[in-house]
């Protein structure tokens, strides 16, 4: 069994991954910005880790000990039109979703490289391969994350470190409700914002995604990109078949 460090394990997908991996007998190191939120998880170790804070990352990596697998899951969402989204919010989003992931990778990768083995698993999104309006800042952070992950596959793969990107579609967590939204009452983009529900399509559970992550970790030769569930598979297949001559939308917009 592997020793697995999970970021953002306090709720949603991260929490489900911790429970699934612990149930399969792996040594699980669950981390979150507020470690008290991890108290009831059936894991081996619970650590404070803020992926946006270098000292916090360094401390957690040291306390965790030898790590075979990193599951990079910590993330958040911002909803706003690109015309008016506060750039400070976009910067914060990238610090968490993108740079935070790389920060933790830089903490665990040297030991993996020296051992000649290890796994880096990134929880991304179908929005790392296609663009949705209003949630574009989130998608941009995931596009960047996937570029980093693919680069790591080319670089660290030479030393025996395997990289995978798990891509869920819409997931039944409170992530959407918790997203920071920036709209005024007379915002000209409100009609588009109100159509976002139609873009969600079929929804999978956090537990569904956790099973995909665990199965990926346990595969001897995992693929680079792993759609999490049939809805994600359909969405990504449709995007792949679509022309690049025009912006792609999975459903027609009427606003």
Language model features with spans:
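Active-site-adjacent segment of SDR/Rossmann-fold oxidoreductases
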Residues: 130, 151-162
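Conserved glycine-rich cofactor-binding loop
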Residues: 10-11
